[in-house]
Amino acid sequence: MHMTSPSAKPLVVSIMGPTASGKTATALAIAEQIPSEIISVDSALVYREMNIGTAKPTDEERASVPHHLIDILDPLDAYSVMQFRQDALRLVAEISARGKLALLVGGTMLYFKGLKDGLDALPQADAALRAELDAEAALIGSPAMHAKLAKLDPITAARLKPNDTQRIQRALEIITLTGQPMSALLAQAPKSELPFTLLPIALEPSERSVLHARIATRFDAMLKDGGLLDEVRALRARGDLHPGLPSMRCVGYRQSWEYLDGAYGLAELREKGIAATRQLAKRQLTWLRGMPERQTIDCLAPDVAGSILRKIVSADKVPK
């Protein structure tokens, strides 16, 4: 293996996949073989005080390999695709300058797309317009706003859930500001050339039922001894958080909040939490299928990390 020459673009590996596909364990195994640092590509892991429901890497795992973009925000705050792109580009440059391999690891596919394709075609947020849209949503509800979006931008509406208020509002905001649907703007946006060579790896299950079983096992582990519920109780006790925030809309947290509100019992919480996680995995796999450049590896196969390592080595650009 050769060191990347100063003029050549460094190699960066993205490890994408649905929830419970083993992305973290795979990245850690790769980092044992090649000097690496991990950049989290996860819209839930950015939040502090949210550890159990996000399946955040443990302190031991984070001590063994440097991790970035984890615990960088208070749950009261929001984090945009634009912010992620800026942070990721900066971190890749810093990690490469240290002679290490940057591993982009996660399941927030919109972040991967934003990093790869850029977002220059989309206008900045307009606070006054957003306030108007928020007021309208409070009046008629998020599903009605989703129906409105479906008439104006059916492509974007099709990939958003009716209760995904934040992204629905953003899509409507873009239409109002530009007169064009977000899907059209993204399609015509000039592709911005990345300052690195990207090796996109997708961990996808050969048997969807096995992934579903993993999801159920993991959610049960989160509920064990009241762990997730205690975490959400502590977040509620702060007094400044509410279910409409991006952080509290994360899978598992929304359902736990509703359970603590008395909306349903523990058995239904488990059922709803597992169903929501399975839906998330389905959406993640749909996103991945729209990335023809990805190199797919069965996340259920033995030695997933070894398969990826062979692909990295064949790229012949890795730090020693």
UniProtKB/Swiss-Prot annotation:
Presence of the UniProt keyword Ribosomal protein in the record: no
GO molecular-function term, one example from the UniProt record: tRNA dimethylallyltransferase activity
Region (Interaction with substrate tRNA): 42-45, 166-170, 249-254
Known catalytic reactions: adenosine(37) in tRNA + dimethylallyl diphosphate = N(6)-dimethylallyladenosine(37) in tRNA + diphosphate
Gene3D superfamilies: 1.10.20.140, P-loop containing nucleotide triphosphate hydrolases (3.40.50.300)
EC number of the protein: 2.5.1.75
Annotated family: Belongs to the IPP transferase family.
Subunit structure: Monomer.
Annotated protein name in UniProt: tRNA dimethylallyltransferase
UniProt organism field: Herminiimonas arsenicoxydans
